[in-house]
Amino acid sequence: MRYQTVFWILLIALCTVNPAKIQDVASYGGTVRLTDSGRAKCSRKTWPCETSEDCCDKNCSDTFWTCQLGYGCSRVCV
């Protein structure tokens, strides 16, 4: 029973999203602009991502949405 309670608390915490961040993403259009260095190679990025340039590009395991929702670009690019 205790594990079930912990599971539901974690699920609710993961589903809670800052509405302001969603609005920022919606107004931005959800596209990612790559810098010249981003096109050449993908480097390790860390949370928090402030702008689209801080977020990993399409060749990385973390996505723009992951960054904008506050979960961070912490994985090594693939």
Curated annotation (Swiss-Prot):
Expressed by the venom gland. GO terms for molecular function: ion channel regulator activity; toxin activity. Disulfide bonds join 42-56, 49-60, 55-77, 67-73. It is found in: Secreted. Keywords: Disulfide bond, Ion channel impairing toxin, Knottin, Secreted, Signal, Toxin. InterPro entries: Spider_insecticidal_peptide (IPR012626). Residues 1-19 form the signal peptide. The keyword tRNA-binding does not apply. Pfam families: Toxin_21. GO terms for cellular component: extracellular region. Belongs to the neurotoxin 13 (insecticidal toxin ABC) family. 03 (JZTX-59) subfamily. The presence of a 'disulfide through disulfide knot' structurally defines this protein as a knottin. Probable ion channel inhibitor. This is U29-theraphotoxin-Cg1a.
